[in-house]
Structure formats: structure tokens, C-alpha cells
């Protein structure tokens, strides 16, 4: 995986709190275990008026022409609550979302997002309010996220955020659990060479 350092992108404002993983990717689309192909089902019950996903809901913000191509999702508190399905960050990533900004995230969803090289940025309610106002008032508004400096830049302002150093290291270097293990491949091979044959 390639690492994440900075990203500037169009923001889609989803002004709803407590969005759960069943809303993000409904259960009927969870048959696959690979990470691709879920983007078309993202927020299915909100984006579409029919079960087949052929009739877009014109009232849903992500269907608005001004937000097409958005790579940053702005939301309210407790985003990603509910079941622990990893398909939720898979669907967001497959749709094109690279960064999520909210006052808080459900713990398991937060970890799953980082494991999938997505950046969940926690800001205060007031800071999120300011970004909502900026995005909704300015068509084409973009926000910049700098993981190295741990800063969000919007409308001439900068907002600092925190992420623990280990997770930040993984994101900056594009490391998932396998990548972390492979960083120690030499030591693993050295240890394996010392194991008696009868234990192999």
C-alpha cells in the first residue's frame, strides 16, 4: 500500500449524527469478502428510491451534482456506530472517500478505517460546524488534510487533530497488519532458522 501524507479534496457534508454501518452498507450487500465493488451500494437506502439502485434519490446530499467526485466526507458525532462490519470502510473507500471528518467515530469503525488506509479525523463540534458552514456556502469547497502535521485546513483556518503515533506511522507508510509483519521478515527468518527440525 502507498502511504498517506497529505490530501486536498472536495467535501460532501452529511449532516446526520449516529450514522450506523447498516446505513453505510446494508446487510444484503455483504456477500463478498474482497474489498472492491461495494462503492455502488454505499448508503444504498438513502441514495436510491428503489431496491435495484436504479432511481437516485434527488434529496440525498451525495447525489447533488455539486458533490460529485467528493473524496472527503464530513459528518456528525458517532459516525460508523452499529455492527463491526469491515465492509463499511470498504464501501466508503471504493466510492472514493479517503478522509472522514467528524466529532467522533465508533471505536471499531475507527480502527477498521485506519486498517484500510482511510483517515478518520476527529475535530470538535464547533470546528466541524465551521467546516459545515464553509462547505455548504461555497460550491466546490475543498479541504486539505495533512497527516504529517496533523492539521486540517479549511477556509483559511487550520484545525489540529490527534491520532496515536503507531496508527499515524502505519498510515504514513502504507502499512497494514501484513506490512507490519513483513517489516520484520529478516528477524522472522533468523528465528525460523534456529528452530529444531523436529519442531518445524
Curated annotation (Swiss-Prot):
CDD domains named among the record's database cross-references: IPMI_Swivel
GO process annotations (BP): L-leucine biosynthetic process
Functional summary from the UniProt entry: Catalyzes the isomerization between 2-isopropylmalate and 3-isopropylmalate, via the formation of 2-isopropylmaleate.
UniProt xrefs under Pfam families: Aconitase_C
GN (gene name): leuD
Designated name of the protein: 3-isopropylmalate dehydratase small subunit
InterPro entries: 3-IsopropMal_deHydase_ssu, Aconitase/3IPM_dehydase_swvl, AconitaseA/IPMdHydase_ssu_swvl, IPMI_Swivel, LeuD
Source species of the chain: Aliivibrio salmonicida (strain LFI1238)
Enzyme class: lyase
Amino acid at each position: 500500500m502507498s502511504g498517506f501524507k497529505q490530501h486536498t479534496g472536495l467535501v460532501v457534508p452529511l449532516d446526520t449524527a449516529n450514522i450506523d454501518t447498516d446505513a453505510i452498507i446494508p446487510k444484503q450487500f455483504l456477500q463478498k469478502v474482497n474489498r472492491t465493488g461495494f462503492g455502488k451500494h454505499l448508503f444504498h437506502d438513502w441514495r436510491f428510491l428503489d431496491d435495484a439502485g436504479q432511481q437516485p434519490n434527488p434529496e440525498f446530499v451525495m447525489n447533488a451534482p455539486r458533490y460529485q467526485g467528493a473524496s472527503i466526507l464530513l459528518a456528525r458525532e458517532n459516525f460508523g456506530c452499529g455492527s463491526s462490519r469491515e465492509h463499511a470502510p470498504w464501501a466508503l473507500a471504493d466510492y472514493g472517500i479517503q478522509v472522514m471528518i467528524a466529532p467522533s467515530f465508533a471505536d471499531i469503525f475507527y480502527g477498521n478505517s485506519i486498517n484500510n488506509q482511510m483517515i478518520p479525523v476527529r475535530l470538535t463540534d464547533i470546528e466541524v460546524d465551521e467546516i459545515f458552514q464553509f462547505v455548504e456556502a461555497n460550491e466546490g469547497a475543498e479541504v486539505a488534510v495533512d497527516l504529517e502535521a496533523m492539521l486540517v485546513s479549511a477556509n483559511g483556518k487550520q484545525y489540529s487533530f490527534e491520532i496515536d503515533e503507531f496508527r499515524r506511522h502505519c498510515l504514513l507508510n502504507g502499512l497494514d497488519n501484513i506490512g507490519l509483519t513483513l517489516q520484520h521478515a529478516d528477524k522472522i527468518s533468523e528465528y525460523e532458522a534456529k528452530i529444531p527440525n523436529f519442531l518445524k
